[in-house]
Amino acid sequence: MKVLAAMSGGVDSSVAAARMVDAGHDVVGVHLALSTAPGALRTGSRGCCSKEDASDARRVADVLGIPFYVWDFAERFKEDVIDDFVSSYARGETPNPCIRCNQRIKFSALYAKALALGFDVVVTGHYARLSEGRLRRAVDQDKDQSYVLAVLTAEQLRHAMFPIGDTPKPQIREEASRRGLAVADKPDSHDICFIPSGNTQTFLGERIGVRRGTVVDAAGAVLATHDGVHGFTIGQRKGLGIPGPGPDGRPRYVTAIDAETGTVRVGDVADLQVHALTGRAPIFTAGTAPTGPLECAVQVRAHGETTSAVAELVGDELSVRLHSPLRGVARGQTLVLYRPDPDGDEVLGSATITATSACSPVS
């Protein structure tokens, strides 16, 4: 089988590529260049997609004895990931750029180029499993990345492989060390790769500018002014620019954001509880949409809690009623549906959250 191994320069994608070589496949390594501006991406051992990472990936490819290339996806990355991230925050949403990168770069732009060049599959170092075409959680629950892959279609999954999903991370590092890969002890990256400073608010402010608005309480009384809704997210408690806690002495949290009026509302923690979600552009990873109400589990953050729910396709939107509430859910987040399974929860689909509601939970 002709395999294109996406090599980030980290230990996970390196071992994934090595396993495909061991399996006897015709493997070619590729690293994605995502920025043309030096210093625009995070650099160093904790980086992602930096020049250092490209060099690390090339050295691993040399050890494995496979061809290696660097493909320039900088413009596509800027348009489909960075610009999308900025515009989402400007709309008062809270997006996940890693999900957009998987959806629009790794398994869209890269995927299309790979198939056009005659490759059978794209291999990555994601912690997830594929079983008979079904996407499942990884064995290592702490590293599971099925959430950020839940935007992939059945067709994309047919041409994808995740070779390390059945192995805990410590064993991956041990394997890399045994193979003599210099990245065996390379730290994981945790931050957004295109924000070198790690300061998301400053990054957004430089691109969106000042769009003044007000911070109000539940009754509509103005508590403070602000320079833009991009500086806030649902559930935020610190950095609100307000004098202190509410009249009852309890902390106040961001409970609603209206980008059109520039209004940020704050309230009690109880106001963050939601029992219903609405999502747009649903994707069902098995390829078929449910024909009626679907009992499932829902997750709204990459490593967040799950709660049981009933999901149903209503027109072109996904309607989800939760059995127990989730706290601090924002528009722009991705909701992912799972089917609980002792052998590894199966991903059923996903959608981008457009609305939340505090209506009564499903009984």
Curated annotation (Swiss-Prot):
Protein name (database record): tRNA-specific 2-thiouridylase MnmA
One GO process term, biological-process aspect: tRNA wobble position uridine thiolation
Residues that coordinate or bind ATP: A6, M7, S8, G9, G10, V11, D12, S13, L32, G125
Family annotation (NCBIfam families): PRK00143.1 (NF001138), trmU (TIGR00420)
Predominant cellular place of this UniProt entry's protein: cytoplasm
Region listing for Interaction with tRNA, in residue ranges: 143-145
RNA-binding as UniProt keyword: yes
Catalytic activity entry: S-sulfanyl-L-cysteinyl-[protein] + uridine(34) in tRNA + AH2 + ATP = 2-thiouridine(34) in tRNA + L-cysteinyl-[protein] + A + AMP + diphosphate + H(+)
Function: Catalyzes the 2-thiolation of uridine at the wobble position (U34) of tRNA, leading to the formation of s(2)U34.
